[in-house]
C-alpha cells in the first residue's frame, strides 16, 4: 500500500491543482486511468479556454466508488464560483449519483474538476477497484450580448451603452445614429454633426425620437443620392420642437437646405408640409439650446427619377422608335428615318442615333434631321451616255436614269435572259446607290459592234482590177508601217489582227531585228496622207502566234499576229471592227470575198485604199498550180487560197496583213475569214491566206475573250 501511494505521488506530483494548457478542446481523466485510481487523494483540475468562449464538459467513462451522498469518493464540478454537481457511482447505474450523459457548461472561460478519494475502497471486507473517469471538454462561443442572470464572475456582463454585437470569441459595441462610440469601446456620446444618408429612401430623426432630444445639439443630416434623382420629404407625427409664441424659433430650430437654397426654418408642434426639393442633395440642420423636453421630429424621404421633355421630330421623315409616355433619367430613345432618308446631325451623316436622358433633365444630344438620300452624279459610261427618266438633274432617292450606248457602233452587254425593259435602267436606292434590278451596282458596258459598216460595198459584178474604196466601205482597215507598208483589221476597239510576217518579215535577219520593232498603226481614213494626219495609235503589246517561223523563208504556217493598242479607239462611221468567223461555210469554193489595202497597184504605191473582189478557190487546184510553179511552200489546213489564174486580180505587196472579208448574209455582218499571207507575184494567179477560223480560240484567249 505504501509503495502504491508512492507511485501515485511520483505520477501526479503533490496533491493540489492541476492547470491544463489553454486549448479549444481536450480530455480529463482520473489518476492512472484506465487503471484503478489511488486512495486518499484530492486533486483539482483547472480547465481554461480562450476569452470569449465557455467550457462544455461531457463524461464518456465514469466508474467511481458509489456511496450515499457521494460521501467517500466523488467528482465535484465547479464554474463561475458555483458548484454544478457532486458525482459518484457508475454510468447507467442507480447507485450513487453518476453524471450520465449530461452536458456541463460554464458561463465564463474556466471550469474546475475536483477528484476526492478516501483511504480505502472496501465493500463487505473485499477490496474493490474502480477505474475512475474519462471526460472531454471543448470551447463553445460565449454570447456576451445575451442576458446572463446567473453570471457572477466579474467581467462577463457586457457594458455596451447602446448596441451589443456578438461574434465567435468576443463582442463589440456600437451607438445609435447621432452618437459616437467613445474610447472605452462601450459608452456613447451624442455626435450628429455629419450624418450622411445615401440610400434612395429612408428615415431621418432627431436623437432619441420619440423621446426628448438631448440639449446643446448642432446636428447636420445630409441626404446625398445619385444625380438624376430628386428628394421628397414627408414629416411624421409627432412633431415637437421648442418654440415661442411671439418670436419665431428662438430656442430650437430645424433648417432645411437644397441646392444651397433655404427651404425654411421649422419649430413648434405643426409638422412641415411635404417638400419636393427638386434636388439630389439636401441638408437638415438641427440646433437645440441647453434645456427643453420636446420629443423632436422624424421624416421619411423618398426619391423620384428626374424627367426629360418628350422628344419631338423635326420633320415628317423622322421616326422615333417605340415612343414612351414619359422619359426619366437614363431612359433613351432611338431615331431612324423613313426609307430613302439619311440621319443628319448638322452636316454629319449618322449610321444610327440614340439620345440619353441626363441627370439634369436634358437630352445629351439634340434631335437629328432626316435628309433624303442622294446617289450623286451617275458615273459616266464609256462609249455611252445616260438620260433622266425622272426629273432631270435630280439624283435623290427613287430617281431613275437609263444608260444607252452610242449606237450603231456600240451595244450594251447584258446578262443572258435579262429583261429588255430594264436594260440600262438604274434607280437611286434607299442605300444611296445607283442600282439596276438585274445587274445590281455593276455598271453596264458598251461593247463594239462588229461587221456593220455604215457604207458597205454593194458592187456585185466581178472586178477585173482593184478599185478605190469609198469612206465606210472597209472601216476596219488598218494601215501599218514596220518594215514597209502593211495592213490589218480592227477587232473590238483596241486590237489589230494582222500577219506575223509584216512584223517579222521572212527576208529579214531575225538577229538584226529589234526585240520590239517600231510599230505605227493608223486607222479611220481611206487616204494615206489623211490617215497619217489623224495620228498613229501606240502599240502596247505585240503577240505573234507560236507556230510562226521567221527563219523558214517558205513556211507561212501560223502567219498571224495581234497588236494590242495602248488605248481603246472611239468607233464611228469610218472606224468599226470586223467580226471573227464561227463556221466552215465561209470557206466554200466560189464564195466571194473582198480584200482591201494600201499596197502596190499597177506597179505603183497606192495613196488611197483600194479593194478587190475575189472568190474562194479550190484547195486542190491551188496545190496543183503551186506544183506547176515549182514552189515548195507548204499549203496546210491552216490556209486557204482565192483568185483565178485566168483573171489577173489579187492582193499584192503592201496588202499583207489585211483581211479577206466575207459578208454573212444571214446575220448581215462582215467576217474576217482570212489574212493576206503570201503568193507568187501580183495578180498572176492564186493568193494564199491564213485561215482565221482555225485561230479563233487563240485570238479570244489572247484578247481575254472581251470582244
Swiss-Prot record:
Post-translational modification: Cleaved and activated by autocatalytic processing to generate Complement C1r subcomponent heavy and light chains that are connected by disulfide bonds.
General function of this protein: Serine protease component of the complement C1 complex, a multiprotein complex that initiates the classical pathway of the complement system, a cascade of proteins that leads to phagocytosis and breakdown of pathogens and signaling that strengthens the adaptive immune system. C1R catalyzes the first enzymatic step in the classical complement pathway: it is activated by the C1Q subcomplex of the C1 complex, which associates with IgG or IgM immunoglobulins complexed with antigens to form antigen-antibody complexes on the surface of pathogens.
Site positions for Cleavage: 462-463
PANTHER family the record matches: COMPLEMENT C1R SUBCOMPONENT, COMPLEMENT COMPONENT 1, S SUBCOMPONENT-RELATED
Domain Sushi residues, every copy: 306-372, 373-448
Residues recorded as bearing Phosphoserine in the entry: 205
Subcellular location: Secreted; Cell surface
Encoding gene, per UniProt annotation: C1ra
Name listed for the protein in its UniProt record: Complement C1r-A subcomponent
Principal location class: secreted
Domain remark from Swiss-Prot or TrEMBL: The CUB domain 2 shows a compact folded structure in the presence of Ca(2+), whereas it has a flexible, disordered conformation in the absence of Ca(2+). Ca(2+) could provide a switch between the folded and disordered forms; low Ca(2+) could provide flexibility to promote autoprocessing and activation of CIR.
(3R)-3-hydroxyasparagine carried by residues: 166
Amino acid at each position: 500500500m505504501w509503495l502504491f501511494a508512492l507511485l501515485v505521488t511520483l505520477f501526479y506530483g503533490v496533491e493540489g491543482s492541476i492547470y491544463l494548457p489553454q486549448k479549444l478542446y481536450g480530455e480529463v481523466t482520473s489518476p492512472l486511468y484506465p487503471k484503478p485510481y489511488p486512495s486518499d487523494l484530492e486533486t483539482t483540475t483547472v480547465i481554461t479556454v480562450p476569452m470569449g468562449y465557455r467550457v462544455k464538459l461531457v463524461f464518456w467513462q465514469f466508474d467511481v466508488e458509489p456511496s450515499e451522498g457521494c460521501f467517500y469518493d466523488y467528482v465535484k464540478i465547479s464554474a463561475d464560483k458555483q458548484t454544478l454537481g457532486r458525482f459518484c457511482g457508475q454510468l447507467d447505474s442507480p447507485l450513487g449519483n453518476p453524471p450520465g450523459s449530461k452536458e456541463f457548461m460554464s458561463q465564463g472561460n474556466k471550469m474546475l474538476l475536483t477528484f476526492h478519494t478516501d483511504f480505502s475502497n472496501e465493500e463487505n471486507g473485499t477490496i474493490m477497484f474502480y477505474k475512475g473517469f474519462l471526460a472531454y471538454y471543448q470551447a463553445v462561443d460565449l454570447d456576451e450580448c445575451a442576458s446572463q442572470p446567473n453570471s457572477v464572475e466579474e467581467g462577463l456582463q457586457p457594458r455596451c451603452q447602446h448596441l451589443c454585437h456578438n461574434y465567435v470569441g468576443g463582442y463589440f459595441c456600437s451607438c445609435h445614429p447621432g452618437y459616437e462610440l467613445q474610447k472605452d469601446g462601450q459608452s456613447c456620446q451624442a455626435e450628429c454633426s455629419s450624418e450622411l444618408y445615401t440610400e434612395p429612401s429612408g428615415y431621418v430623426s432627431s436623437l432619441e425620437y420619440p423621446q426628448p432630444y438631448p440639449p446643446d445639439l448642432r446636428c447636420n443630416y445630409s441626404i446625398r443620392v445619385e444625380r438624376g434623382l430628386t428628394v421628397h420629404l414627408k414629416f411624421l407625427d409627432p412633431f415637437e420642437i421648442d418654440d415661442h409664441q411671439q418670436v419665431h424659433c428662438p430656442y430650437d430650430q430645424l433648417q432645411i437646405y437644397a441646392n444651397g437654397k433655404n427651404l425654411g426654418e421649422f419649430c413648434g408642434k405643426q409638422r412641415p408640409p411635404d417638400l419636393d426639393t427638386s434636388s439630389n442633395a439636401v441638408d437638415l440642420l438641427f440646433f437645440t439650446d441647453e434645456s427643453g423636453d420636446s420629443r423632436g421630429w422624424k421624416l421619411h424621404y423618398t426619391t423620384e427619377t428626374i424627367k426629360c421633355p418628350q422628344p419631338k421630330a423635326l420633320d415628317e421623315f423622322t421616326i422615333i422608335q417605340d415612343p414612351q409616355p414619359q422619359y426619366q433619367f437614363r431612359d433613351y430613345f432611338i431615331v431612324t428615318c423613313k426609307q430613302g432618308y439619311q440621319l443628319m446631325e448638322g452636316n454629319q451623316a449618322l449610321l444610327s442615333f440614340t439620345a440619353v436622358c441626363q441627370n439634369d433633365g436634358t437630352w445629351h444630344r439634340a434631335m437629328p434631321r432626316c435628309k433624303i438620300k442622294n446617289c450623286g452624279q451617275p458615273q459616266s459610261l464609256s462609249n455611252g451616255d445616260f438620260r433622266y427618266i425622272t426629273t432631270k438633274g435630280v439624283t435623290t432617292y427613287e430617281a431613275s436614269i437609263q444608260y444607252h450606248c452610242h449606237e450603231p457602233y456600240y451595244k450594251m452587254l447584258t446578262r443572258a435572259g435579262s429583261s429588255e425593259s430594264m436594260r440600262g435602267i438604274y434607280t437611286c436606292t434607299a442605300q444611296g446607290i445607283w442600282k439596276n434590278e438585274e445587274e445590281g451596282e455593276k455598271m453596264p458596258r458598251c461593247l463594239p459592234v462588229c461587221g456593220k459598216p455604215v457604207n458597205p460595198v454593194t458592187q456585185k459584178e466581178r472586178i477585173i482590177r482593184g478599185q478605190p474604196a469609198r469612206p465606210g466601205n472597209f472601216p476596219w482597215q488598218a494601215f501599218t508601217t514596220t518594215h514597209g507598208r502593211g495592213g490589218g483589221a480592227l477587232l473590238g476597239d483596241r486590237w489589230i489582227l494582222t500577219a506575223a510576217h509584216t512584223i517579222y518579215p521572212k527576208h529579214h535577219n531575225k538577229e538584226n531585228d529589234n526585240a520590239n520593232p517600231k510599230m505605227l498603226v493608223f486607222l479611220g481614213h481611206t487616204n494615206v496622207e489623211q490617215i497619217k494626219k489623224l495620228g498613229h495609235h501606240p502599240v502596247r503589246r505585240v503577240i505573234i502566234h507560236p507556230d510562226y517561223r521567221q527563219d523558214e523563208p517558205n513556211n507561212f504556217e501560223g502567219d498571224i499576229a495581234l497588236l494590242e493598242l495602248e488605248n481603246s479607239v472611239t468607233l464611228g462611221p469610218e472606224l468599226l471592227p470586223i467580226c471573227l468567223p464561227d463556221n466552215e461555210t465561209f470557206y466554200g469554193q466560189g464564195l466571194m470575198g473582198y480584200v482591201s489595202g494600201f499596197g502596190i497597184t499597177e506597179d505603183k504605191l497606192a495613196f488611197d485604199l483600194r479593194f478587190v473582189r475575189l472568190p474562194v478557190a479550190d484547195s486542190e487546184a491551188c496545190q496543183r498550180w503551186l506544183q506547176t510553179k515549182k514552189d515548195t511552200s507548204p499549203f496546210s489546213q491552216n490556209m486557204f487560197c482565192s483568185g483565178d489564174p485566168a483573171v489577173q486580180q489579187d492582193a499584192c505587196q503592201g496588202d499583207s496583213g489585211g483581211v479577206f472579208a466575207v459578208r454573212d448574209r444571214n446575220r448581215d455582218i462582215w467576217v474576217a475569214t482570212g489574212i493576206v499571207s503570201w503568193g507568187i507575184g501580183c495578180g498572176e494567179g492564186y493568193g494564199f491566206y491564213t485561215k482565221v477560223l482555225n485561230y479563233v480560240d487563240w485570238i479570244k484567249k489572247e484578247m481575254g475573250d472581251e470582244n
